[in-house]
Structures are given as structure tokens and as C-alpha cells.
Amino acid sequence: MLLKYFKPVLLIFAFTNLMGQSSYQTFNKANSFYETKLYDSSKSLYLELYNNGMISKELFLNLGNSYFKLDSLPAAILFYEKGLKIAPGNKDLTHNLQFCNTLLKDKNSIKKSILINELILSFLGKSPNYWAYSSIVVMFITCLLFVFYWITHESFWKKIYFYSCTLTLLLLFVTIGLSAISKSKVSESKYGIIFSPTTKVMVEPSQSSSTTYQLHEGSKAKITGENEDWYEISFNDRKGWVQKVYLKKI
């Protein structure tokens, strides 16, 4: 049952057009490495795409799977969480993350959002690439309707094309706005994953401070503040400070 989920997924055709032939070939090559159990090679190629700015739930899922196969639990959790930021409720990401969470030493009691919030997040949680592609499609339709409006002489059809063009123009602004919101959402980091096997959470942002509790690798903590070298975090309503080198933002 578990192996069914920890498999790479393919990108849909529309998305391959958006990200370019070179990235598409790299993605497929990474998938081939994964299928032949060359997990370190697949991870390197997925990371190359990620570092070049590619954002998609497929990439985050496959990257998380590669790290999981390499026994790097914190990194796997990090990318599953990144994927769920742009695709809330995705079954593969959710299943794999839940399984990884059963392997953690620290159990977190993060409250789940209510249904209406989940529905809103599901709608707004499309990737920036998805909304950018949608904007291009809507812009093309708008231009086409404007051309029809310009060349048509019949009053009835002229009105139809005018109102249709107006509606698609409004829709264009909406998709552009959602693309910006989605990009901001991906960049926003309110939580982080612990990457050290054992991390001391200090009372104050100082190594000479006393330890209030400890966290282990893979734990997800809420970031409530920061200074130059430390994050203030909250875990199960317990606050404290950890050094930035031990925590990576989602």
C-alpha cells in the first residue's frame, strides 16, 4: 500500500508547455532515475529544477519521495509541506506526509482548519505557474473576442462580443491577482522543519541560556519571531528559541 504512493508522478501536458522543453526533459530524466532506484541522481535533478524557480506539486512530491528513499526524513517532510502549501488536500502529498509523521519522535498537535477554510485554500492553493498559464489563456480569449467585436458589423453580435470581452478582461485581472497571491503564499513561511537529530530549544536566543525543551529531526514548529541567528518558535504551545542553522522554513 505504501509503495503505491511513493512513486513519481508525471506532469500534465499543459504544464509542460509552460515550464519549457528543457525543464520537461530534466523532469522526465529525474523520474527515470527514480524508477531505476537511483534516488540520489533523481534528487539532484529535482533540486536543480527547484533552484531554477520551478514550483509545482508534482516536483515537491517527487523531491520529497527521493529524500524519503534516501532516509532523509526532515527533507522529505519539508518538501511534502511545500507541496501542500500550493495544493492543500492533495491525497499523495497528504498520505506521504502523514506516514512520515508517524516516524517522528515529537508529536505535534497543530489544529486543522475548518472546512470552509480548506475549501478556500484549495481554490487559492494552485501554483503560481497554474495561474500564470490561466492568465495567458484568458488573455488570448480576450484578444480573440476583441477582434471579433472589431470586425463584426451586426449590432446583436457586436454587443455579445463586447460584453464577453469585458467579462474575460475582468477574469484576466482576477487570474493575474491570484497568481500574485499564490506566489506570495508560496514565499510566506510561518512554519519550519527541524533538521538536527536533536535540537535544544532555549529560553532566550543565546547558547548560554537554559534549555526549555528539545526537538528532534522532522518536527514542525511555528515561527513566531527571529533575530540575526535565532528563530523564536512555538511547538504544542511551548515557546523558545532555536538557532537558524537547525531549522529550515517551509
Question: Positions of the model-derived regions?
Answer:
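Boundary regions of SH3-family modules and the immediately adjacent low-complexity/disordered segments
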Residues: 159-196, 203-206, 210, 222-224, ...
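Membrane-embedded alpha-helical segments of integral membrane proteins
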Residues: 111-151
